[in-house]
Structures are given as C-alpha cells and as structure tokens.
UniProtKB/Swiss-Prot annotation:
tr-type G domain mapped to chain residues: 10-214
Region listing for G2, in residue ranges: 60-64
Pfam family, one: GTP_EFTU
Name of the protein described by the UniProt record: Elongation factor Tu, chloroplastic
Domain of life of the organism encoding this protein: Eukaryota
Binding residues annotated for GTP, in chain numbering: 19-26, 81-85, 136-139
HAMAP family per the UniProt record, alphabetical: EF_Tu_B
Catalytic activity: GTP + H2O = GDP + phosphate + H(+)
Cell location: Plastid, Chloroplast
Keyword Nucleotide-binding: yes
Organism: Thalassiosira pseudonana
Length: 409
C-alpha cells in the first residue's frame, strides 16, 4: 500500500505528559489515543507500545521518548511521553521534544509528589509556556472534598512556580477506566461513557487553553553561521541552517557575537547551488553579504534581523550533568570549573560561577547525573537568549546539557 501523504489541514501543536512516576502519564497517553480513535482522530496505542520507547540521541545524550500523534476536531497533535524520570529531565533540558504545552498528570489519590514539583519547575525553566492538569485515578477517591483539596494543592503549586494556578484547567478522570471501557466496547461514542467523556473533556481543555504556537517562519530571522568563505569578485558567503524566520535578498541583517555587532545587506541567497529570492526557517543556505571581509566574520556568530539579539557573557541556566555511563565525567566538578560551552555552532570557554539547588541553597560540587541551576560567565560575548539550548564539553566530549533560563549581562 502506498504511504499516506501527511495532510496539513489543521494547525499543529506539540504537547507531552509530565508528572510524578506512577501517576499515570503513559496510561493517559494510551487513553487519549484510544478515545480519539473512536472519532477517527488517532490510532489506539497500548501502554506497552508507548512504554517501550525507542532510544534517541539529542546533543550527544541518549533519551528514551515515545512519540504518538492524534487529532481533535480542531488540531493535529504530536505527543511525547517518556518512560523514566531521568528521560524527562534530559528531554526537557535538551529540547529534544519541544513542547508548546504540557498535560501535568497528578494522581487524585496521592496528590502532588516530589517529581510533580520538579517537572513544574523544569517546565518553567525551559520555557514550556502552558500547562493543563489531569487529575487521574478519580475512581480511587470516594470523597469529593478530597478531590477539591488535591485540586487546590495543585493550583497553589503551579502558582508557586509562576504559572497562572487559578486559571489553569484541571480535569478529573481515570485513564485506566477509560481504556477499560474502550477495550470492552471500541464503538463507545461521546456521551456513552462518563470515563471516556472525561478524556474528551481533557482534550477540549487542551484545545481551548494551549494556544497554537507561532510557527518558526513567523518569528524574527536568525541563522547561526557554520562556515564562511570568499567568492572572488562577489564577496563573502556565510552558510548555515536558518533557525527561524524568513530572509530575502536586499534585507539588512546584523552579524552578532565575538566583537562588535556589524550591519550588512544580503546580496544573494543560494541553496543546493541554486539562487533563491528568499530563505525560510529550516533551509540550509549560503548567504552573500555586502562589504563584509572574510576576517570580520566567523563560525559561531549569528546573522539576525537588526535589534533582535545581542551578545552576552553571563547567564543562568538549568543543566543536566551526564553520568559516566552516558559518556560524561567519572568525577564531580566544582565552582570555578572552566569547560567549553557549545553554543549553536561553536565552543566558547566559560567559567562556572555558582551552582544553586532547587531550594535556593548554594552548592559547591556537582556529581554526574545531577540536575542543577548554574550561573556561568563566557570569556567573550556571544549571541545568547533565554530558552536557548547548549552543551557543556570537555576535550570535545559532551559532559552536560543546558538551557538558558535568564540573561545576567
């Protein structure tokens, strides 16, 4: 049978399930696919299909992630679910699966637990902009007052981490009950079964509350420079992959990073040896720049729309330190450690100024396998922005992954 063509008729949104171990993230993922399959919007997946997630590599780190896709009446979703807690931490920090929003799964029988808190904090730090809550295992709670208490507790916790706790939709239900109802009768329609209806209600909330993200092409232009060469008689060409936005011949752009920011005009764009009038996010292009000498531009700089990105040296970040099994260090490192920070396309040396634990205490030492808040200073300014991912390297091997949470200077 010929492969089906991917029809882009509905807006696309990336989401994922987050929350404490055993609160039902994977069961909920299975329940969503089974529920939407009744309306033709998904292929039902079993728990075991999702839980046996294949390994992937992102920024040199191995992560287990399951990807499922489904559709509601309004949207197409790509949904990511991770089997293990460490996989979540790595996934969120490396941005291997970017989330436009998340479904926080909390067991109504247990209430918020340590990883509930940690995943909310991580979502805040790495820039997951919106959260919808599913209070799972409602069938195990006989007392409505208890359910209200858990809901209140979740709202307070979300507010603690600067999410709008009072406004976030919280949907109660039972993923397992919904799956059982659907496996005994796959033709259940909306309105036939209260547990299945609760999954539909959750997806209504996700449709309504998580906004359709701005597509990469709608954002301001940015391209990290991977290589530079001169074409005799024509000028200097910078090559790279356009990270976001659209760029046209005749546009003015800034060259940012390492030294003073320069402004220039684009006189030509090429892709696969063909000339283009414009390049879009995702394209690998060569951009011909007017009046720029080969000496004034190098790998690691970025081309951007004027005034949209500035070079910085000091930043706060959320970092995951690789274990030795993952190819990281065997020993801890301390404040003052000077690794390389691999930012977009280049290594920049920097020193680690401070480590801070989740509770705000200063930590002197970090062990392989830890997740920590880290303040760093680079030896020269490069184009950095909040939400940007980077790797920490030592002698060419990756020893950590991070995401910028705040620019200091």
């Amino acid at each position: 049978m010929a492969r089906e063509k991917f029809e882009r008729t509905k807006p696309h949104v990336n989401i994922g399930t987050i929350g404490h171990v055993d609160h039902g993230k994977t069961t909920l993922t299975a329940a969503i696919t089974a529920t939407l399959a009744t309306a033709g919007g998904a292929v039902a997946k079993d728990y075991s299909d999702i839980d046996g997630a294949p390994e992937e590599r992102a920024r040199g780190i191995t992560i287990n992630t399951a990807h499922v896709e489904y559709e509601t009446a309004d949207r197409h979703y790509a949904h990511v679910d991770c089997p293990g807690h460490a996989d979540y931490v790595k996934n969120m920090i490396t941005g291997a699966a970017q989330m436009d929003g998340a479904i926080l799964v909390v067991s109504a029988a247990d209430g918020p637990m340590p990883q509930t808190r940690e995943h909310i904090l991580l979502a805040k730090q790495v820039g997951v902009p919106h959260i919808v809550v599913f209070l799972n295992k409602q069938d195990q709670v006989d007392d409505d007052e208890l359910l209200e208490l858990v809901e209140l507790e979740v709202r307070e916790l979300l507010s603690t981490y600067d999410f709008p706790g009072d406004d976030i939709p919280i949907c109660p239900g039972s993923a397992l009950q919904a799956i059982e109802a659907l496996s005994s009768n796959p033709d259940v329609k909306r309105g036939d079964n209260p547990w299945v209806d609760k999954i539909f209600a959750l997806m209504d909330a996700v449709d309504a509350y998580i906004p359709t993200p701005e597509r990469d092409v709608e954002k301001t232009f940015l391209m990290a420079i991977e290589d530079v060469f001169s074409i005799t008689g024509r000028g200097t060409v910078a090559t790279g992959r356009i990270e976001r936005g659209v760029v046209k011949v005749g546009d003015n752009v800034e060259i940012v990073g390492v030294g003073d920011t320069q402004t220039t005009t684009i006189t030509g764009i090429e892709m696969f040896q063909k000339t283009l009038e414009e390049g879009f996010a995702g394209d690998n292009v060569g951009i011909l720049l007017r009046g720029v000498t080969r000496e004034n531009i190098e790998r690691g700089m970025v081309l951007s729309k004027p005034g949209t990105i500035t070079p910085h040296t000091n930043f706060e970040s959320e970092v995951y330190v690789l274990t030795k099994e993952e190819g990281g260090r065997h020993t801890p490192f301390f404040t003052g450690y000077r690794p390389q920070f691999y930012v977009r396309t280049t290594d920049v040396t920097g020193s680690i100024e401070q480590f801070t634990a989740d509770d705000g205490t200063i930590v002197e030492m970090v062990m392989p396998g830890d997740r920590i808040k880290m303040t760093a200073e680079l030896i020269y300014p490069v184009a950095i922005e909040e939400g940007m991912r980077f790797a920490i390297r030592e002698g060419g091997r990756t020893i950590g992954a991070g995401v910028v949470s705040k620019i200091v200077k």
